[in-house]
Amino acid sequence: ILDSFTLLTAELTAELTAELTARKKQYSYYRDTLIQKECKSEKVKLNTVCEIYDGTHQTPKYTNGGIPFVSVENIDDLYGTQKFISTEAYAKYKIKPRIGDVFMTRITAGIIGKCTVVERNDDLAYYVSLALLRPNADILDSKYLKYYLESVWGRRELSKWILWDATPTKINKDDIGRVLISVPPLDTQKRLVQVIEHFDVICTDLNIGLPGEIEARQKQYEYYRDLLLTFAETGSTLMT
């Protein structure tokens, strides 16, 4: 019985995991298809429509509280960082993040070009492994920039400048500015962002539900496994 239940749980978990992977691929395909339609627009160097900075090149002295400090490991959750620096250290930052800025991973063993749009005006210190992109709001929408750089088309452009032999891999700040990006009219960018975000919400809801289902199935398996083992050891009657 236990072997059969183990096999059933493993098969179900594999199916749910495959579904989660499929949803992520579906989102990426949909985003890339929408971006591709805009690749016919005029391409410009990123540094002509965007200011580009990077963070401190020195590992800071961390404090128990103060100003949140982020690096590539925080790209998915900027405000969840557990590292802080003093207000005195932060005062030395010449460029402080503000709403509409875009953080992009630029030095990492992971993915170069992963982005997050800054949505708060809270103080936030950042490391050299992150580039801070400040789009010209009259020309370039922040979220469009994020989606473009994360698309297959943006990654192709970034890959031309990535130093693949470096450890970890990186793209120099000045080379980020040489990346070509398609810039359709601003209203077109905003419409595209609206469509991608709508689809993103759908995929995110599914992605939240599927891992929860996998965890629930695992807990269910562990419960019945322990119950069966207890029954086998004691000869007790199984209770429901």
Model feature map: region roles:
Residues 1-24, 28, 145, 177-218, ...:
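Amphipathic alpha-helical segments
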